[in-house]
Amino acid sequence: MPAPRYKSGSAKKVYKRAPGNRRVLHIRRKKQSSAKCGACGALLNGVPSLRTVQVSKLSKTQRRPERAFGGALCPKCVKKMMVVKARNY
């Protein structure tokens, strides 16, 4: 019987071959999906695709780019938004 923490559907199940030609179930954590732009859905560069615990151990500059809306919007959307805001100001 697996431990309760391994019975989750979010755990990735991998079968490995052990000595004696046995198949053994190994349970791994799934990979985190990449960060996406909030406006257009494009993949964000400079943002690591790690789990929350691992991201919290990184320094602040390694977590997201140091520009306006870094880690939330892609550069194209930021540029568009700034142009629109400047024209409406």
Swiss-Prot record:
GO terms for molecular function: structural constituent of ribosome. The keyword Ribonucleoprotein applies. GO terms for cellular component: ribonucleoprotein complex; ribosome. One of its GO terms (biological process) is translation. Keywords: Ribonucleoprotein, Ribosomal protein. Belongs to the eukaryotic ribosomal protein eL34 family. This is Large ribosomal subunit protein eL34. The lineage of its organism: Archaea, Methanobacteriati, Methanobacteriota, Methanomada group, Methanococci. The gene is rpl34e.
